[in-house]
Amino acid sequence: MLSCLGLAFLLLSLLIVQPQVLSCRVGDQRECDASPFVPGHNLIGEGFDMVTMQRKGAYVIDMETYLNPNRTCTLCSNQLKGHQLQKVILIKVKSWTRACSGTITLMIAAFKIFLCVKYASARLDVVGTQSTVYKFASNMMREDRYTFSTQKRMFSHYSYRVSAAPPFSSEFLKDLARLPRYYNSSTSSHYKDFLHTYGTHYIHQVRLGGYVARVTAARTCLSTLNGMSSNDVHSCVSMGIEVGLGNFKLSNVPSPCSKFLQNHGFSTVFSSYIHHHYTVISGGNGWSGEFSLTHNDSLGFKNWQHTLKDHPDVVFFFLRPIHLLIPTKTKRVGIKVTATKYLEDNAMESSPREPECTGNTPNLARNCCPQQVLKGTLRVTSIRAWGLNGDYAGATERLANKRLEIFVNITDVINSDYPYWNVDYNFGKVYTLQVLAVEIWDEDLQYDDLLGSCVRYLSQGDNSFTCAAESGRFEVQYTLTCDPYLTGERCGHLSH
């Protein structure tokens, strides 16, 4: 199984880990009973569900036994806690680490979903389809095209791993013993229940500490309209993170990015925000993980950071399939089959790539996003009039004059009080907030008389309108076609 912390085509890890030499010794039972456990001792050996991306709270490995058969244990000096002696369970304590900070940034391509795991050769993005982050991203993508970017600030203090032959927890052994020996259609429900309790994998190795991750969903085409690529969005949010954590000033942020961070100042007809975010926090206490991107809002972050040594949580882990632990071959096969089916049933097809438009299509960027809104193609298809009174010379001579702003197109002269111009005037690309002005004239030898005029705002689709003349009326028919990926009455909205 190939695991990937999600959707990424770029992953930059700047975490600096500084391991300390462990100082451990053997303690007798009296010392062992009196000493506290190492922080987060129970955050390893736990079952894990790869679909929900959540720990199950049920332990595969015995995480409480700390005494060896000779009634001794291992006591280690925790340099992060004033060299306090702390006991370890029968696992491997790899190292303490100094409180070390760094930023793990993750550029996430549009249309893709977090927390993907390639499962075997199924060619499916499997994992996390029931996780809260996945649901956030899915809900965003139902609404519009989004580009996702994640910034994570991580602190790692402790590192543990399960020993080569770990002792099983008593509950795990009992549930395993109750499991039918063979997997088939009549026993499959028992295997599903077992999977529901313990998950698909177990945590084999961990780094403990804390992290806060901010998942930003930015409207792809709205960003493009305002001159920001997906890379620009990612860099901008990264600068906003530094502003919020007190490492940068908003005044030093370029103007387009500053407006982006403040979610305003974008010259479109949209009323909705250009970006939304979802926050995930692990470890520590006393802070929700929320902070501003436009001013120094770092107090909660700094206070939370100080709580991580006493209240660590998993910030990085290695998983192993539970079935690899099962000693009985038939049960091992049954658990593997059940887990495989569960993962495949909750998988999604591989996320589509961001569309790419090539060629010379006007008003369309390479990512198939409009470069301007309120743009379309205008065609006037017919004009007809009735009941017009012309000059005294006989049948009235008529001239239809259509214009859009300074663009003027003049029809042929028709000698009738009921003229009909079956025409196709293509005005080409127009700004849809302009108006269509039509004038009907009576052409004379000396002076032309204006018989009627009309002005209308444009609307998308096939349209007609009727206007009054000095006597009679006239009707105009036209078609306004929005540019690709634009919609709305005046082509002012982005289509999904």
Ranges and model annotations:
Residues G390-G472:
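Peripheral membrane lipid-binding modules
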Residues N231-V237, L374-G376, T396-R398, Q434, ...:
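Residues at beta-strand starts and edge strands
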Residues M1-L12:
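Classical eukaryotic N-terminal signal peptides for Sec-dependent ER targeting/secretion
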Residues V337, K341-P370, N389-Y392, S459-H496:
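Acidic, phospholipid-interacting surfaces centered on C2/C2-like domain membrane-binding loops
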